[in-house]
Amino acid sequence: MDATQGRRHTADAGGQGTADADAEQFWERHYGTRRAWDAHVNPLLAETAAPLCPGVALDLGCGPGGDTIWLAQQGWHVTAVDISTTAVERVRDRARDLGIAGRVVTEQHDLASSFPAGQFDLVSAQYFHTPFAFPRGRVLRTAAHALRPDGLLLIVDHGSTAPWSWNQDPDIHYPTPTEIAAELDLDPEHWSVLRAEMPGRQATGPAGETATVIDNVLLVQRRDRSMAA
Ligand SMILES: C[S@@+](CC[C@H](N)C(=O)[O-])C[C@H]1O[C@@H](n2cnc3c(N)ncnc32)[C@H](O)[C@@H]1O
């Protein structure tokens, strides 16, 4: 993957990248037509990161940026990445409005073709789903390789369909944490699975309705110091 092709959104940087036009348009429409921009940290990320000493984090598919903003507010330096230019621009603007712009860099990437440069203490992939063909296993494996020694990769996926979800495909299969770990295909000599669980939680839909939904959670730690770049 080419780390140079993303479009960086800071006060002082610009550039052009390539992206799958359909996927980019889809997610641009998704965020461009979104009036409410309410974004909160995922509790599973907060639970994982709260005990850690703040370092350098990467938020893959940051979307509205609730996770990025929360991490930056805890003292982390965060690179927030999304295929949607609207999403990353809004995260950048929100960070600026909150006075934490110095700890947030936003970059537009189609992660199928480019990946941000750097080494990270924490990589977070929260509900990193897309309806388009996407080499997710390869991207997440690249993320695992971008970890510093002792760094953590937290993947939180949907494990069930909420009644208000835009995707009600009855045949949808949500990969289990074990299946996600198998897709990553990481050498157990160098990466450890710290958590592979499917907890339920009470979720609230856009109209205030509630339902129990499942999250598929995988937490991986890089162990091998000799492999770090
Ligand atoms: C289901 S949303 C989750 C957003 C956010 N992480 C959250 O928890 O609310 C999936 C996110 O992945 C982004 N995404 C989809 N395909 C992508 C790609 N090829 N490269 C980078 N980001 C992508 C979307 O724009 C979207 O923001």
Per-region residue spans from a language model:
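Conserved class I S-adenosyl-L-methionine
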Residues: 1-52, 55-63, 161
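Class I SAM-dependent methyltransferase SAM/SAH-binding core
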Residues: 68-111
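A short acidic, Gly/Pro-enriched loop at the edge of an enzyme's catalytic core
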Residues: 115-122
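A short, conserved alpha-helix within the catalytic core of class I
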Residues: 130-143
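Conserved beta-strand signature within the Rossmann-like core of class I S-adenosyl-L-methionine
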Residues: 150-158
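Short alpha-helix
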Residues: 173-189, 195-196
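Core SAM-dependent methyltransferase catalytic element
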Residues: 204-229
